[in-house]
């Protein structure tokens, strides 16, 4: 079957299982917070760690999981990652206490990191070169479907069965994906001795990213003493400096320095962070603006689905609608510019259901054009042998963007004068300004990439629409 002309697309379909589940899990959990507060008898400040620990573990482990995939085989790491994720999901649904749930969420993050770090690499090495952009769009579409279903499905499951069902829903999909991956994913193992793994670099990465995320959470309203926040900020800076020094001096770095010296890669990773900041920011912002008017979590989730649905449509069909002669940078610029225009206009418009739905849909369309094109530029910036590591870096950038989107929206609402409760149109302006600036940054990054195809010899060039190199 692997030799059939359909085999690459069957492999892409298997990877879409992981893309779907990853984004479903990202958007479904937060809606269960009130139910968990009642069940465990704890405040929301404690329940927030259910999401925070998952995000910390995911960002810290993505690069190691990508390197592991390059060393021992992407199919092996991806399949075992799904197994870990599925078992941990079932265990989360049986957690007897909040502490146990937090620990199990960290185990779930281990499996998710193994999935996400290798998913983009499996797509790019499975799909035909001339169809890579379309394949990445299909994967992005699967992500958007998971993201769109999360809030509504989570609210429905919590109301009818209970919050534990939110974790159990991962189990049947996970089992199906493990079986499909065993037979449909291509073998990528390179029977060579893997390099020594950079465990000190991994620990430093865990330290500074964890401290940074805690600082961002504190800036967004988490009740931490000032001295604790200052100490965490100092730890984040010191950890980052030590991590950079380690990666520059060690013989076997976790993140090879030559990768980060690539201008297309550096721009692409920054673009990925900006794109996911704009994608996840409204998921925090809009419930604060319209949650009271809509009256239920299910209705709020249904309204929010306009953003990921627009994202999915553009990711799947943008390759057909846009001119075939356009480069990835041109496609990315068009999408980011559309999103920037929408967010910029939102600064001056009243926030109502009638205005927010088309705004979210248009912003989603723009992001659906930008993200696959940006991913293609990143994955073509180096050789296939580093594809899993690149995939891990892309997922790490997405995680950072997601975290920034959540934290900066809370901070912007605070700066707008919202201490608790719901915000009005005027109070939301700082948040929309943040989203517009992030989208404008993504557009500038894509515009800068247009010169790459005319770059000097020896540098990676952007792929043309036919799949070759221009």
Name these PLM-found stretches.
Residues 1-7, 191, 448-470:
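Intrinsic disorder in cytosolic terminal tails and internal cytosolic loops
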Residues 21-32, 57, 74, 166, ...:
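Short helix-kink/termination motifs in transmembrane helices of multi-pass secondary transporters
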Residues 159-271, 278, 302, 435-436, ...:
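Hydrophobic transmembrane-helix bundles of small-molecule transporters
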